[in-house]
């Protein structure tokens, strides 16, 4: 997993319910915790673009519901700034279900994916149809 050059604001708190935009069968997932989050004692973990999270499937197919999985944030509404000065924000918050190595479980990703995610997780970049 490669580092991100941009300073991404962590805008998605633990407990947030977010759309899942791949074809695994999950529609809505809830963030339980964030992998490799180092924060202050008693502070709720929060995630931004390119962070891997432990999620619970809230809505989806009966086989997928109530499962604990890993997912990566591919879009967030909160604006962030790239090193070239460009400000980027998306219309919604979205996640993609992955395995431990960051390889997506689905074969299709709906909507755009941030370039920072494609740099950190190359397999998500190849699966995505649009990279912004």
From Swiss-Prot:
Gene Ontology CC: cytosolic large ribosomal subunit
InterPro entries to which the protein is assigned, alphabetical: Ribosomal_uL14, Ribosomal_uL14_arc, Ribosomal_uL14_CS, Ribosomal_uL14_sf
Pfam families: Ribosomal_L14
Annotated keywords: Ribonucleoprotein, Ribosomal protein, RNA-binding, rRNA-binding
Keyword Lipid biosynthesis found: no
A GO molecular-function descriptor: large ribosomal subunit rRNA binding
UniProt key word RNA-binding: yes
Biological processes per GO annotation: translation
Entry similarity comment: Belongs to the universal ribosomal protein uL14 family.
Function as written in the Swiss-Prot or TrEMBL entry: Binds to 23S rRNA. Forms part of two intersubunit bridges in the 70S ribosome.
The protein's assembly and partners: Part of the 50S ribosomal subunit. Forms a cluster with proteins L3 and L24e, part of which may contact the 16S rRNA in 2 intersubunit bridges.
Annotated NCBIfam families: PRK08571.1, uL14_arch
HAMAP family, per database record: Ribosomal_uL14
Descriptive protein name: Large ribosomal subunit protein uL14
Organism of provenance: Methanosarcina mazei (strain ATCC BAA-159 / DSM 3647 / Goe1 / Go1 / JCM 11833 / OCM 88) (Methanosarcina frisia)
